[in-house]
Amino acid sequence: CCGVPNAACHPCVCTGKC
């Protein structure tokens, strides 16, 4: 998911700030 444009994935998953 990280760095890959995916509508199903939220950026907060990569940053750890959800």
UniProtKB/Swiss-Prot annotation:
<dbReference type="GO" id="GO:0030550">
    <property type="term" value="F:acetylcholine receptor inhibitor activity"/>
</dbReference>
<keyword id="KW-0872">Ion channel impairing toxin</keyword>
<dbReference type="GO" id="GO:0035792">
    <property type="term" value="C:host cell postsynaptic membrane"/>
</dbReference>
<feature type="modified residue" description="4-hydroxyproline">
    <location>
        <position position="11"/>
    </location>
</feature>
<dbReference type="GO" id="GO:0090729">
    <property type="term" value="F:toxin activity"/>
</dbReference>
<keyword id="KW-0528">Neurotoxin</keyword>
<keyword id="KW-0008">Acetylcholine receptor inhibiting toxin</keyword>
<keyword id="KW-0379">Hydroxylation</keyword>
<keyword id="KW-0629">Postsynaptic neurotoxin</keyword>
<keyword id="KW-0964">Secreted</keyword>
<dbReference type="GO" id="GO:0005576">
    <property type="term" value="C:extracellular region"/>
</dbReference>
<protein>
    <recommendedName>
        <fullName>Alpha-conotoxin PeIVA</fullName>
    </recommendedName>
</protein>
<feature type="modified residue" description="4-hydroxyproline">
    <location>
        <position position="5"/>
    </location>
</feature>
<keyword id="KW-0800">Toxin</keyword>
<comment type="similarity">
    <text>Belongs to the conotoxin A superfamily.</text>
</comment>
<keyword id="KW-1015">Disulfide bond</keyword>
<dbReference type="GO" id="GO:0099106">
    <property type="term" value="F:ion channel regulator activity"/>
</dbReference>
<comment type="function">
    <text>Alpha-conotoxins act on postsynaptic membranes, they bind to the nicotinic acetylcholine receptors (nAChR) and thus inhibit them. This toxin has higher affinity for the fetal (alpha-1/beta-1/gamma/delta subunits) subtype (IC(50)=&lt;5 nM) of the receptor than for the adult (alpha-1/beta-1/epsilon/delta) subtype (IC(50)=4000 nM). It blocks the elicited currents completely and dissociates very slowly from the fetal muscle receptor.</text>
</comment>
